Regions:
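Conserved, carboxylate-rich catalytic/transport cores that coordinate ions
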Residues: 1-302
Length: 302
């Protein structure tokens, strides 16, 4: 390659700082930026949902202990890569589907009516506009309306929790959040088995080796079994990562009990309030007994 770059280097270049970039790379980066924005606008028109949920990057000391947390970089070069990946994933899934080749899809079912009605009721109780049975376009408008406001994190979290979980399956369900009818994971075969399956299917297609029973060409039933397994292992890995991250942060906070923390309310129950740290991204429960001497009454609708 001509030059290896970080997201931060590309971001600085796109903002006018050209010092670290080789001249022959500059036109390519500018073209990538322009193309990504064109793709993003088209996908916005199609109804793609952009959830704004900042990730926390842990800061470690020399001994390997967590000493702080900071917002992970989310500059536009990340979106450039995301747009290109989504295009590649969709293009490959479309080619395989149009040739009737069984393929492992990344599917994201539409939210159920009951959940959407509850979401609308909650959002409307906060003074925000949303139809009683919101569609994807109205959810997109809601997320755009709260972007950059104090309520952004809370609204993005409740929208996320109203969504079904994405999964791996050969079924033709589509991907709701991406507004894509044909979608499969293709761009990360070194870390996801689903991508490797799609690479194998594409390899068979390009070689014209499509006879039934080929080791690299599982049928739909085999794909369904594999899909259930890798969906389970994906969720297990995500849960393990989340739990480890929480434990490391709690170890850091052990000597900070009693200090104030900037949080957002993420849920209410009859026994307390769930809050999430804006900086660290972990969630905890504030029990009613800890809220002071006032009288509190839980109203599930408000």
């Amino acid at each position: 390659s001509t030059q290896r770059l970080t997201y931060q280097q590309v971001d600085r270049f796109l903002k006018g700082h050209t010092k670290d970039i080789k001249p022959e790379v500059m036109p390519l980066l500018n073209d990538m930026n322009k193309l990504a924005r064109i793709i993003e606008k088209r996908r916005d028109r199609q109804g793609m949902l952009h959830l704004d949920l900042p990730e926390t990057e842990l800061v470690f000391d020399e001994a390997g202990r967590v000493v702080d947390g900071q917002p992970a970089d989310n500059s536009y070069p990340h979106t450039i890569i995301e747009m290109f990946m989504v295009e590649a994933n969709e293009a490959v899934a479309t080619v395989l589907d149009s040739n009737n080749i069984p393929v492992m899809r990344r599917v994201h079912p539409e939210p159920d009516t009951f959940t959407l009605r509850n979401l609308a009721e909650l959002v409307r109780s906060l003074g925000l506009s949303l139809p009683r049975l919101p569609d994807r376009a109205s959810l997109q408008q809601l997320l755009g309306a709260v972007k950059g406001t104090d309520s952004s994190l809370a609204i993005n979290l409740v929208v996320l929790r109203s969504m079904e979980k994405a999964q791996y399956s050969p079924l033709h369900i589509g991907h709701y959040a991406l507004a894509s009818e044909l979608y499969g994971h293709f761009t990360s075969p070194i870390r996801r088995y689903a991508d490797l399956l799609v690479h194998r299917a594409l390899d068979c297609y390009l070689r014209g080796n499509l006879e039934a029973g080929h080791d690299w060409m599982p049928d739909n039933q085999q794909l369904a079994d594999i899909g259930r397994h890798i969906t389970f292992t994906e969720e297990r890995a995500a849960d393990s990562e989340r739990e480890l991250k929480t434990v490391l942060i709690l170890q850091m906070l052990a000597d900070k009990v009693g200090q104030d923390m900037d949080c957002v309310v993420t849920g209410l129950t009859n026994f307390g309030i769930f809050v999430q740290s804006r900086k660290l991204g972990i969630e905890g429960l504030v029990q009613l007994a800890d809220l002071g001497p006032d009288q509190w009454q839980y109203n599930p609708k408000h």
